[in-house]
Amino acid sequence: MSLKLIFEIDWLKTLRFNFHYFPLRQAVRIPAYVYWNTSFVEMGGNVHLNCPAKAGLLRIGPHAIGIKDRKTRTLWQVMGGVEVDGSVHLGRGCKVCEEKGALLKIGEHFHVTGDTTIVCKKSVSFGKDCLLSWDVMVMDTDFHHIYGNCEEVNKPRSIAVGNHVWIGMGVTILKGVKICDDVVVSANSSITKNLDESHCVYGGVGRGVEILKRDIDWKR
């Protein structure tokens, strides 16, 4: 471990997180690193590793890119379940907000650059090898309630993102959306419907989202 990394990690919060969420045999391996400027708003629910516990497997709040302020605060507000399948990088400024009874599933090789918000009231899942740029919003709820004929018409609905998906800067993904494997979502898009065709670049807002290019692949 480099000297720079040693000083970037908040070791008190790191120890607190690991020994709060993981059984002793996993916690002693320090599978989660918590970096400076990370706030624990809520440390409820549970975090489950579906893979061997390795040091630094889950990284919360590392500084990733120079154009973002190092003073930006990362927030962890979790009261539901979190499942981790492999390495996870939640860059500085990320906000994870999960309500009691909800489930957040994260596949291996998951990377968020920073300043991204994930709001989970029911279920949000990401497949393996997903990349999220900065200022992304993923939200499976409208927070407030809308009624028609005395029935709620905007209940939370699950979000499912497939494998090898790249979400561009400033994208919003709203409740009920399913995104298939091998997709790129272009910057500043607002996704409210399913993206069903693989190896495509999608872009647009709401019902205007369309395929911008087919037969593509992408690499980090």
Predicted regions and their residues:
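Domain-scale signature associated with acetyltransferase and cell-envelope carbohydrate enzymes
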Residues: M1-M139, G162-H164, V171, D181, ...
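Short, conserved secondary-structure segments in the cores of folded domains
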Residues: V78-G80, R157, K175
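Short, flexible helix-coil linker/hinge segments at the edges of structured domains or between repeats
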Residues: D142, I146-V153
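Flexible glycine-rich beta->alpha loop in the catalytic core of nucleotide-sugar glycosyltransferases
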Residues: F143-H144, S189-S190, D196-E197
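Short secondary-structure boundary/capping segments
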Residues: E151, I191-T192
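Glycine-rich NAD(P)-binding loop of Rossmann-like domains
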Residues: E151-G162
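A generic "structured core" feature
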Residues: L174, I179-C180, V184-S190
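Conserved sequence/active-site signature of Rossmann-fold short-chain dehydrogenase/reductase
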Residues: S190-I191, R207
